[in-house]
Amino acid sequence: MKMKKVSRRDLLAGGASLLALGGAAAYTKAMRAKPTVRETGPAISAFLPERDLAGLGHPMTAYAKIGGVELSRLILGGNMIGGWAHCRDMRFYDRLVKAYFADERVFRNFRIAEACGVNTILTNPALMRVINRYWREEGGKIKFISDCGYKGGVIKGAIASVENGASMVYFHGGHADSHACKGEWKAFREYLDESRKLGVPVGIGCHRLATVKFCVEHDCLPDFWMKTVHRVDYPTAHLGEDKKKSANGLGVCDNRFVDTDRQEVFDYMQSRPEPWIAFKVLGAGIEHPRGAFPVAYSGGADFICCGMYDYQVVEDVNVANDYFANGLPDRTRPWHG
């Protein structure tokens, strides 16, 4: 049999391919290695390229408990990972972020968050699969708070979430606003009663301050609040407002996620004894964390939930750490949690 002559160029190319395959296999094996002890920030950082944590001053040091569950004061938001990007009129963007966040990219996001001391992801039951895969295959320990937005309703969403490892659950904000607008206080009472049977802290989420007031008025008090707070002085904040056509009273455009300015929220929450997780503090990208985080913490937020791409986590953790290192300037509301 006549052998094919192999050129020097073919030989070098083949060798390079083998080296690349070998390197990829070694990298994959290293990334999937399972530590036998509970992973802390420094332990997880050993499994990340140094560049991923470049610029990190130190991991989060501020933690507090809600109902016995210890949370970092900065929580990773999961809207972007699930494809709910809130990008105004850029309708293509939801599909773009879903394509970006393939499972391996989600794992990377979680690994960086944990290495930076962010120990919790807050998201929808739709992400239960990838979260469980991360725990199972990557050895991750990140905690999961579920918004219970589920095809069978929020109570079934709470049950499914806890069965899949959720440490805490809360009444989805959009659904809560709609029920409050309709005066359906019994929906909150039923959710709180049924979800508390699951043995985890139970919250109520909302975008409207009126929803918080409605729940308080009807003695539907959760273990914690999920309440939006952000600036409303940006150019698109009031575009397309037509509250009469919106079931939740917020208008139909994806431009704004509150019904009042920040100060009104801060003033009301000042007297509430329940822990408050603030979300949408950046207004879905209209303000930098350097401006928004200190305002939210100083205004009374006990925790901030913020969507962060993998390349944003280090900077956002540094901003949060700087606030706590500076002596909690201007905060008057007692810390809860």
PLM regions: where:
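N-terminal secretory signal peptides and thylakoid transit peptides that target proteins
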Residues: K2-L19
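C-terminal segment of N-terminal export signals and the immediately downstream linker at the start
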Residues: A26-S72
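Conserved, mostly hydrophobic/aromatic
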Residues: L76, V202, W276
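Active-site-adjacent beta->alpha loops and helix N-cap segments on the catalytic face
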Residues: L127-Y134, V154, D177-E190, Q263, ...
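Acidic (Asp/Glu)-rich catalytic clusters
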Residues: I131-G139, A158-G165, D219, Q270, ...
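Glycine-rich phosphate-binding active-site loops on the catalytic face of alpha/beta enzymes
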Residues: H175, V229-R231, G299-V313
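Catalytic alpha/beta core domains of metabolic enzymes, predominantly
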Residues: G205-F293
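C-terminal helical cap(s) of enzyme catalytic domains, especially alpha/beta-barrels
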Residues: V313-R333
